[in-house]
């Protein structure tokens, strides 16, 4: 990892794992690691496995709140706790790794600024992704003070195929034997906490072995399995390139990555949902009629007539805004575009035990190519019903098992009330 800061960081004897309920409650432990000099003050990379990006911003929070950590912690919630840390200068690289049912931000690389809005003194961003636009968080660069650069990578992690689980266990068994045989060989690397067994050569050997086995085996299943492992290796290489820009990294896992609920789906009765749909149909009919009239005549009289209807008052501001930008607005096109821009609902996918196992194997395959993190944070997210309460304990144990298999001894801190999520 880059920077001279790395050379002066303290090392934990065992990898600390902080397990909390609400996701933003991991932040005090990250700040504690910064204060104890286990993490640098700046240029930290943050690897975030979650069904939700958590990259919103407290809309009305003054930007300078980030410089008073106790005030900051009291202002944050589960959806908006990462970006203030970026503005504070601690996180410079964020990788959101998401399952296939979570599509809130476009996949790929996003480079933008996070800074203080000169007019409101709140935190805002220069990203034009719908995720930020829909919450009114975008401002142009010239409107920002003290901007911080953020490199955001959004990466999809596919579950392994069912047939692969047993096959991968065999590969890992071989890899362990290779590690034992090479236990006398150690390497000092920029990612290590001192001498450690050679991991990179083992991973490469395993991968090469998989490729050779595939070439000599006509089984399509085996080829697919090897391709999946190779895919995880490629994703890991991409993440390693990102980590090389930072001075240290935190691995963060929300257990709803493996199984997630949209708690709002259960808040309404069938009758309430029917009423909501009927009201929405009437609203769409009114909008269609209003825009049809505007196509014929967009005079102030027409606009005011429609704006007098319930729920249509914002039409005046919309039409005035359109007229200021174009001589003859195409109201039909604007109406059609409006019908397609509803923001995606919260992800909802209650996984089977098999699906959870397959995702756990994918996470294992991904992490085994990465260097050891400085610390791990885990959010249960069960009290707010994002991770199913009947699954959360099982998922937590399985995740800890994966971490132990990869990193050895763990220093686990359970910072939540025992039994708080029991079904």
Swiss-Prot record:
Pfam family, one: UPF0489
Name this polypeptide is given: UPF0489 protein C5orf22 homolog
Family indicated by similarity: Belongs to the UPF0489 family.
InterPro entries: UPF0489
